Amino acid sequence: MRKEKLFHLLVLLGFTLLSMTISAQTDSRDVYGWLRYDDYNQDEYGICKFKTDAADDIQPVWPYDQARVACAGAFAEGFYYVYLYETDGYNATPYSFNRIDLSTGESTQVADYRGMPFLFQDMTYDYSTQTMYAIGYDESVYTTLLVKGNLTTGETTIAGKIGESKYVALACSYEGQVYAIDVDYGDLWSIDKFTGAA
């Protein structure tokens, strides 16, 4: 009797796991980003997308001029926001902060960033406070800064100093916790969005 109950329990568990797997497969979502480089086709540059269940199948959506390089971007309030810079092959110079309508591909410059003293490494949107955050390394003071950006004007304010380490990625949970990954070791850090402390 015990073996029979165990067998039925295992069969039930198997069907439950099977239904969860099938459900997970049907929940595929589109992920948008900015394609900076493609081994197969170096002419594809700009907004791209892929499915969560097929991340290796990247599809270009809206191509953009390769003279303007994106180094940070994030989706917020119905638009994709991107920080662009120019390069002469040796040096990178801040260029602009743009808003892109993903349904039409139309790009609108929000702010001219040519006077900005540093480049953003990444951006993320905090849905809990409706705030865009970015990280940038200021070479003049050897410090990574946590920056808040105004989506309407492009104006930036320093939220805090993270420290001397450089960071390459930034993310924010729906609850408002900011995270960054350092360049040197690939460690994930929790960032205080009010002080910048890691």
Where are these regions (language model features)?
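A short beta-strand motif characteristic of beta-propeller blades
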Residues: 55-66, 106-114, 154-161, 197-198
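Conserved beta-propeller blade signature
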Residues: 28-38, 79-84, 131-135, 177-180, ...
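A short loop-to-beta-strand structural motif that recurs across blades of beta-propeller domains
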Residues: 45-48, 95-98, 144-147, 186-190
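Bacterial N-terminal signal peptides
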Residues: 9-19
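Repeated scaffold domains used in trafficking and secretory/extracellular systems
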Residues: 66-78, 115-128, 164-175
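Short glycine/acidic-enriched loop and turn motifs that connect beta-strands
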Residues: 37-43, 86-92, 138-142, 185-187
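Short loop/turn segments that connect beta-strands within beta-propeller blades
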Residues: 51-55, 100-105, 149-154, 192-197
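An edge-strand/N-cap motif at the start of beta-rich repeat modules
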Residues: 24-62, 73-75, 80
